[in-house]
Amino acid sequence: MNVSSFLLAIDSGNTAIKWGLHTGDQWLVRGSALQSERMVLKQAWALLPAPPASVLISNVAGLQAADDLTALLKPWYVQPHWITASASQCGVTSRYTKPEQLGCDRWAALIAAWYRVQRACLVVDVGTAMTVDTLSSTGEFLGGIIVPGPDAMKQALAGCAGTLAAPVSSCFQNFPVNTENALYSGMIQALSGALERMYRLLSSYSEKQTLTEVIMTGGGAALLAQHIHIPHRIVDSLVLEGLAIIAKSGNFDYNKK
């Protein structure tokens, strides 16, 4: 095992930070922390079996999160690389009008998904927001949608309707018979409906497109997966996988936060 090639990959999302130490072939250790508890990372990283030789970061949580991560990385004297989306990378090409404006987490997830399946698929990240992105059978990112995730929907309802916030005990019903279940079921229907509609759209995009599954990731993936009726798999830490693939390709040079 060549410790001089260890990569620390960091996925700094809106709510949580996921990280992993990669050997070039496999994950040696992985962990996570809430954005509100970033200093927990200092303790976790102090226990790493070896210092990273490189650091690759996907950050969508803003400049303060970037500054805090930079400070936490200083003891290793390693210059972190902050990825951005591009027109083409690691076999994936982008149709985005301005490719660099695509969220770097979405881009890393697309690269990981393409590396896994090499065919047309949906890449679904269920977090603070839910993104549903489309990949063609040739690795072309056709575009995608962004909708509020489960927690964001709950908070929005609580903010505008106070007592209408769905309690934890709410459950899904096809035909809800109380207000709490109506709110919860509506949230599930909205998210699963958006996902399944995108599935149908990609399926009809071209006769040559063959969808075999949906690749799901994010904190809300397991919840939503219970309510969709299309082939799918859940991949934990898909963004980290994408970062490891990008790092291994050597096709990056992003030092700006």
Swiss-Prot record:
Listed EC numbers: 2.7.1.33
The domain of life is: Bacteria
Q: Which InterPro entries match?
A: ATPase_NBD, Type_III_PanK
Instruction: Tell me the CDD domains matching this sequence.
Output: ASKHA_NBD_PanK-III
Q: Give the reactions, separated by semicolons, that this protein catalyses.
A: (R)-pantothenate + ATP = (R)-4'-phosphopantothenate + ADP + H(+)
- Any Pfam family matching the protein: Pan_kinase
- Keyword Cytoplasm (UniProt): yes
Give the co-factor note: A monovalent cation. Ammonium or potassium.
Query: Which co-factor is required?
Result: NH4(+); K(+)
* Keywords carried by this UniProt record: ATP-binding, Coenzyme A biosynthesis, Cytoplasm, Kinase, Metal-binding, Nucleotide-binding, Potassium, Transferase
Swiss-Prot/TrEMBL GO biological process terms:
coenzyme A biosynthetic process
Q: Which GO terms describe its cellular component?
A: cytoplasm
Where does the UniProt entry say this protein principally localizes? cytoplasm
Which amino acid positions bind substrate, per UniProt? 96, 103-106, 179
Residues that hold ATP according to the record: 11-18, 128
* Pathway connected to this protein: Cofactor biosynthesis; coenzyme A biosynthesis; CoA from (R)-pantothenate: step 1/5
**Catalytic residue list:** 105
Say yes or no: keyword ATP-binding present. Answer: yes
What is its subcellular localisation? Cytoplasm
Describe the subunit structure. Answer: Homodimer.
- Which HAMAP family does the entry mention? Pantothen_kinase_3 (MF_01274)
Q: Sorted alphabetically, which NCBIfam families does this protein's record hold?
A: baf
Q: What does this protein do?
A: Catalyzes the phosphorylation of pantothenate (Pan), the first step in CoA biosynthesis.
Question: What does the sequence similarity comment in the record state about its family?
Answer: Belongs to the type III pantothenate kinase family.
In Swiss-Prot or TrEMBL terms, this protein is called Type III pantothenate kinase
This chain is encoded by the gene named coaX
